[in-house]
Regions:
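N-terminal lobe/hinge region of extracytoplasmic solute-binding protein
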Residues: 3-57, 88, 163, 497
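Surface-exposed binding/hinge segments that line
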Residues: 65, 101-148, 167-174
Length: 514
């Protein structure tokens, strides 16, 4: 058995919730997908599908031929009817069971079972990104009985009820502290393109243990109490390497770790204020003092490794004198305590703490001092992850949002911006049914109407230009998932956006004994 130290335990194993890394880290090892995305080349290959899909001319219809002989851990068969049931649920959700739809399946109309092992998907608009979406955690395939569960059934306390077709099965759950994954001895349907391993997993299983404190995860590695640990903080990377431990910084290839501004809030409605915030933050100082070379400085809202990246570096230079001039021009005058005021109101902004992101609170502390230097008060919203997630959706609670998204797909940016989807900028207000910036939403809708990936890549570049021109975001760094592991661990990899894969892991017994 391999012991894996995780900073956060899963909170939901419903695949559309797999974006949260602790959720995706479990799903990646217990559930398969139609296609497999090579984490190095990002090329798509058959997995549960026998081949890449047959598509029509405008990418609105996709036909998959399903591999025969695949079974779920509960003994049921993975066939076309089961694939249909998976995708119909993920695309549409089910309000009665509190199951939300996947944001990665926009414009999904229906699926159709052609025969026992052939399924066809229909979309109302061109969807060239759909094949890649079939390779990700949010569309992980689960058994029919599992798909009948409600939100509670996918939540902590019910993990052993989740049945996937992956190389591991959840055997035991100690709620909130431990998860035991056991290897399936009959697993024999890995992606044929995988060169590192085929057949059942090499290891017997994985003990996923909660180690919330950074020092506990590092200490467990140094003391040989764990074999692999996730979220090794930057100051600890060198320490582990000095102890002859391995460190892997896996890219997440999507929306960078960034601050983005809820621009409908009155304090951030003036573009000059947003620009002032951007130019007041010294990212080089933050990266050199809190992070390591594993965290490249952000050059756009998208990572350099992301599909569709376009360099925007010139928009984010550190220039606090420019910040002060911009605030002066916008009518914000320093008050008695140095914090700027206008019409009797203080320029006081609240940031969220992004609990899953590395060193979010420490970074805020540095940013707080930098903004104070130009006369802006910065406050940190209090509370745990649940409280933070709720506050981020309310511009009166949080005006500057700290977050990121890992996803290796050209649709990532448009999905992230979409006011009728993720609504990351809170551009759409449901109460008034209005957009603060209609042009931004128009760009999203135009994007999803485009038929070819080339057109979408060009539009992604235009959206990046627009976000920079409007000063809606400050990209901080390209966030990796950093793992530490023992020298005797071989074959440990991640999928395309950094979630752990234990399938090909081997233990060098001789080195382990030493």
């Amino acid at each position: 058995m391999v012991t894996y130290a995780e900073p956060n335990m899963f909170n939901n194993l419903y695949p559309p919730a797999g974006g949260y890394y602790p959720n995706g880290g479990v799903l990646n090892n217990i559930a398969d997908r139609l296609l497999w995305q090579d984490p190095e080349t990002l090329e798509l290959h058959p997995w549960i599908a026998e081949d890449l899909p047959d598509t029509n001319a405008d990418d609105t219809e996709f036909t998959f031929h399903i591999r025969k002989g695949v079974t779920y851990s509960d003994g049921s068969v993975l066939d076309a009817a089961n694939v249909k049931k998976n995708y119909d649920l993920y695309a549409k959700g089910d309000d009665s069971r509190m199951l939300t739809p996947s944001e990665q399946l926009p414009n999904y109309v229906k699926s159709e079972v052609i025969d026992d092992y052939t399924v066809k998907f229909y979309f109302s608009e061109p969807s060239p990104g759909f094949p890649q979406s079939t390779s990700v955690m949010n569309q992980a395939l689960l058994s029919n009985d599992t798909l009948d569960l409600d939100d509670t059934g996918f939540s902590p306390g019910h993990a052993t009820d989740i049945s996937g077709s992956g190389p591991f099965v959840i055997e035991q759950e100690d709620m909130g502290t431990k998860l035991v994954l056991k290897a399936r001895k009959d697993y024999d349907w890995a992606p044929p393109a995988r060169k590192d391993h085929q057949g059942p997993a090499e290891i017997e299983g994985i003990n996923v243990v909660l180690a919330a404190e950074d020092s506990v995860r590092v200490g467990s590695l140094v003391a040989h109490q764990s074999d692999i640990a996730r979220q090794i903080e930057a100051p600890d990377e060198k320490h582990l390497k000095d102890k002859n431990l391995q460190v892997l910084a896996a890219p997440t290839r999507g929306v960078n770790n960034s601050y983005h501004f809820h621009f409908r809030h009155p304090l951030l409605a003036d573009k000059r204020v947003r620009q002032a915030l951007i130019h007041a933050i010294d990212r080089d100082n933050i990266l050199s003092t809190l992070y390591s070379d594993s965290y490249p400085k952000g050059s756009s809202i998208l990572a350099r490794t992301a599909v569709g990246f376009k360099d925007q570096s010139d928009n984010y230079a550190f220039d606090p004198d420019k910040s002060r001039r911009l605030l002066d021009e916008a009518g914000w005058i320093p008050g008695e305590d140095g914090i700027r005021v206008k019409d009797g109101e203080r320029l006081s902004l609240t940031f969220n703490e992004s609990v899953p992101q590395p060193r979010s609170r420490e970074m805020f502390t540095k940013v707080q001092e930098m903004l104070k230097n130009i006369g802006v008060e910065a406050n940190l919203y209090p509370g745990d992850r649940t409280a933070q997630d709720k506050a981020m959706k309310d511009q009166d609670s949080v005006q500057v949002r700290h977050s990121m998204v890992g996803r290796a797909n050209v649709d990532t940016l448009a999905t992230w911006i979409n006011g009728k989807g993720r609504n990351s900028f809170l551009n759409y207000d449901e109460g008034t049914d209005s957009f603060g910036d209609p042009k931004l939403q128009d760009m999203v809708e135009e994007y999803f109407s485009l038929k070819s990936e080339k057109e979408r890549l060009e539009m992604s570049g235009r959206m990046q230009d627009y976000l920079s021109e409007q000063a809606y975001i400050l990209p901080l760094f390209e966030e990796p998932q950093v793992y530490g592991f023992q020298p005797y661990v071989e074959g440990f990899t991640t999928e395309a956006i950094g979630r752990p894969s234990f399938y090909a892991v081997k233990i060098n017994a001789e080195e382990r004994q030493e």
